[in-house]
Amino acid sequence: MYLTSEIKKEIFKTNGTAKSATDTGSPESQIALFSHRIAHLTEHLKVNKKDYSTQLGLMKLVGKRRRLLNYLQKTEISRYRAIIAQLNLRK
């Protein structure tokens, strides 16, 4: 499987608010996890162009990440700018 518990812990440790492996609820850690999943699905769709169910799942993930980014932008702009810079996302 592409997303093992070790990979998730590493993502949460490097991107969460508390910088711990158990910080799974902060918007930063969820955005980082969604970004990892989006990158994986994008690579899958480059090979399998007609996989429309995966394409639908990818669009839903992008929407979830966008909503979390909008939430961070409205509540704490400094955390929003930090996660955008850290993950190299464009707005």
From Swiss-Prot:
<dbReference type="GO" id="GO:0003735">
    <property type="term" value="F:structural constituent of ribosome"/>
</dbReference>
<dbReference type="Pfam" id="PF00312">
    <property type="entry name" value="Ribosomal_S15"/>
</dbReference>
<dbReference type="InterPro" id="IPR000589">
    <property type="entry name" value="Ribosomal_uS15"/>
</dbReference>
<keyword id="KW-0694">RNA-binding</keyword>
<dbReference type="InterPro" id="IPR005290">
    <property type="entry name" value="Ribosomal_uS15_bac-type"/>
</dbReference>
<keyword id="KW-0699">rRNA-binding</keyword>
<dbReference type="GO" id="GO:0006412">
    <property type="term" value="P:translation"/>
</dbReference>
<keyword id="KW-0687">Ribonucleoprotein</keyword>
<dbReference type="GO" id="GO:0022627">
    <property type="term" value="C:cytosolic small ribosomal subunit"/>
</dbReference>
<dbReference type="GO" id="GO:0019843">
    <property type="term" value="F:rRNA binding"/>
</dbReference>
<dbReference type="InterPro" id="IPR009068">
    <property type="entry name" value="uS15_NS1_RNA-bd_sf"/>
</dbReference>
<comment type="subunit">
    <text>Part of the 30S ribosomal subunit. Forms a bridge to the 50S subunit in the 70S ribosome, contacting the 23S rRNA.</text>
</comment>
<comment type="function">
    <text>One of the primary rRNA binding proteins, it binds directly to 16S rRNA where it helps nucleate assembly of the platform of the 30S subunit by binding and bridging several RNA helices of the 16S rRNA.</text>
</comment>
<comment type="function">
    <text>Forms an intersubunit bridge (bridge B4) with the 23S rRNA of the 50S subunit in the ribosome.</text>
</comment>
<keyword id="KW-0689">Ribosomal protein</keyword>
<protein>
    <recommendedName>
        <fullName>Small ribosomal subunit protein uS15</fullName>
    </recommendedName>
</protein>
<comment type="similarity">
    <text>Belongs to the universal ribosomal protein uS15 family.</text>
</comment>
